[in-house]
């Protein structure tokens, strides 16, 4: 069977599309990936995978509508979408496959049809390659920052990511707990604009977001002692699951959709202190952004730096992540 996958150029979206294609090819399908909604290669099946981003949705919906053959529309939705700016005719007969129960709820909130969710998965071939990088990365980190605990963050800078709160965490940890801060270092992969912020000496900008291979990002997760995911709303939250697959415990808020796949026992979860509603015009969504108290995040970081069971946590998280193998989850697209 010839299959076309229509997607977007965001790195996280492209990665999932490549994984879907890999599973389909292993099962005998001939797959072409396109990022142009105005040109769909000849195919018997079409899979659209894009974020539910109302301002840019119409061309993709039209391509889906026009396609004659089997078709599936897979999506992620971080908040309640504004469908007033979307062509209602093109929406009416689409049954969306969400990537989480949370994405499904956001779509259902505005009356859209949803199928059973297909969680994002882990490509364990990439994990295997990334694990080969980890010893070298750890060796360099231990040489440059001996006898310290390393915390990693991979995050964009949109409002919902809560990186503004992390800047406060960095500063308060260093001012209120200087002795503890001496043994802690933070390593950040983010957008270049992050470097415009004044941060303490133990906060290091490692690389620009979206410009590294997947193996490098997974290797980065594996080289850290802990990963922090400060985000306040996500359609899914791949950094949490990817870190788990590399055996690195994650500090994150207890909130949907993380609570659909995280480990309450082996990750470190902090409570949300409030939920802020914010309409983002650029994304055409109303976000419910979970916020945490600065002190709660600091306490979680300090607790993590003192834990004695980090290796047990690592083993358990790797075991849990195996449930989310792309070769099991993405067989849904073979239908």
UniProtKB/Swiss-Prot annotation:
Record bears the keyword Transferase: yes
Enzyme's top EC category: transferase
Family annotation (Gene3D superfamilies): Glycogen Phosphorylase B
Keywords of this entry: Glycosyltransferase, Transferase
Superkingdom field: Viruses
EC number: 2.4.-.-
Gene Ontology molecular function: any one: glycosyltransferase activity
InterPro entries: Glyco_trans_1
PANTHER family: GLYCOSYLTRANSFERASE WBBK-RELATED
Assigned protein family: Belongs to the glycosyltransferase group 1 family. Glycosyltransferase 4 subfamily.
Official protein name in the record: Uncharacterized glycosyltransferase 335
């Amino acid at each position: 069977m010839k299959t076309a996958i229509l997607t977007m150029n965001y790195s996280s979206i492209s990665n999932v599309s490549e994984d879907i294609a890999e599973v389909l090819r292993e099962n005998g399908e001939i797959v072409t990936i396109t990022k142009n909604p105005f040109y769909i290669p000849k195919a018997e099946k079409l899979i659209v995978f894009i974020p539910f981003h109302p301002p840019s949705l119409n061309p993709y919906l039209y391509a889906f509508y026009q396609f004659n053959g089997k078709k599936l529309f897979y999506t992620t939705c971080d908040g309640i979408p504004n469908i007033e700016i979307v062509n209602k005719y093109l929406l009416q007969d689409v049954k969306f496959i969400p990537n989480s129960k949370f994405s499904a709820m956001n779509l259902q909130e505005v009356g859209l049809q949803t199928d059973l969710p297909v969680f994002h998965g882990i490509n364990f071939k990439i994990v295997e390659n990334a694990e080969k990088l980890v010893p070298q990365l750890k060796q360099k980190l231990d040489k440059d920052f001996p006898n310290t605990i390393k915390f990693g963050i991979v995050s964009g800078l949109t409002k919902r990511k809560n990186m503004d709160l992390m800047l406060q965490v960095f500063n308060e940890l260093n001012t209120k707990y200087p002795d503890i801060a001496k043994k802690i270092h933070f390593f950040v992969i983010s957008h270049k604009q992050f470097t415009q912020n004044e941060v303490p000496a133990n906060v290091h900008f490692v690389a620009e977001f979206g410009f590294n291979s997947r193996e490098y990002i997974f290797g980065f997760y594996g080289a850290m002692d802990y990963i922090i995911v400060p985000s306040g709303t996500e359609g899914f939250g791949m950094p949490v699951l990817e870190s788990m697959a590399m055996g690195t415990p994650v500090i994150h808020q207890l909130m949907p959709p993380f609570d659909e796949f995280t480990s309450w026992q082996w990750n470190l979860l902090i409570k949300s202190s409030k939920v802020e509603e914010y309409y983002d015009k650029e994304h055409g969504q109303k976000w419910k952004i979970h916020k945490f108290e600065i002190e709660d995040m600091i306490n979680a970081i300090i607790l993590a730096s003192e834990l004695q069971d980090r290796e047990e946590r690592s083993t358990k998280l790797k075991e849990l992540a195996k449930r989310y193998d792309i070769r099991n989850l993405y067989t849904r697209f073979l239908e």
